A protein has these predicted regions:
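A structural boundary/capping signal
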Residues: 1-238
């Protein structure tokens, strides 16, 4: 009888020990688990063909072929300070997006590359645009997109586009809003609108925005154009 009781206790203790080990192992596996991609992220990142988009940029020491994704510089302290000082990271994603747009509109003055730099096309990095406080359409769009991501809006919701609009070639930011998980235009210089994000037309419904040559977010670039050669000689929107 004593032996049976002792044996039962040993089995119980062993069971408790194994249960504890399983619990610990399960927790460790959860901690190591790779986060699953948001299905909306997967959808929008696969809706259009991915392409390598290279911008030919002229520097003092020569010409460089730059992957357009390098225009995202979300660790720049100037951008981080703007977001923090102006509380651009407060509110819903839609509210943050609009606050970022309004900040760019209020603080960056539009000027053509030809007037500012003497050449028809020169894409500035965000820190350059912030220093000069002025820039062409793509310059403000690049600042806007960076601010939005630093404001903790998921990267896949933020996209910079280059293409045709009514009047010529243009670069602008689009945003996948929370309202219906569809993209809308956030344009800081061409038909700027201060209306709430939820009240905007879908990008696809905007009558004055035509075909896109290419677009990109922080991780991927999309479109048929593999270099910027297709932009040469295009008529830029004033």
């Amino acid at each position: 009888m004593d032996n049976s009781i002792e044996g039962w206790k040993m089995c119980r203790d062993k069971k408790d020990e194994l249960t504890g080990q399983v619990t610990t192992l399960t927790k460790k596996l959860k901690d190591l688990a790779i986060p699953q991609e948001d299905p909306r992220e997967a959808y929008w990142n696969s809706k259009y063909p991915k392409k390598t988009i290279v911008y030919k940029r002229t520097e003092k020491d020569g010409n460089y072929s730059i992957d357009v994704r390098n225009y995202f510089q979300i660790n720049d302290f100037n951008l981080l300070k703007i977001v923090e000082d102006n509380k651009l990271n407060v509110g819903t994603f839609d509210e943050r997006a609009l606050k970022c747009l309004n900040w760019v509109k209020a603080n960056i003055t539009y000027i053509s590359d030809k007037t500012e730099y003497g050449i028809s096309e020169f894409w500035c990095y965000a820190y350059q645009t912030l220093k000069h406080k002025k820039g062409d359409c793509e310059d403000g769009s690049i600042v806007l997109a960076n601010l939005m991501i630093i404001a903790k809006i998921p990267y896949w919701r933020v996209r910079i586009n280059a293409g045709n609009v009514s009047g010529g070639g243009h670069a602008y930011t689009t945003y996948c809003r929370e309202t219906d998980e569809q993209f809308v235009v956030l344009d800081w210089c061409y038909w700027y609108k201060s209306i709430p994000v939820s009240e905007r037309k879908l990008h696809s419904e905007e009558a004055d925005y035509y075909g896109i040559w290419f677009s990109w977010n922080q991780k991927y670039s999309f479109g048929a154009m593999e270099t910027m050669s297709g932009m040469e000689g295009f008529k830029r929107v004033k």
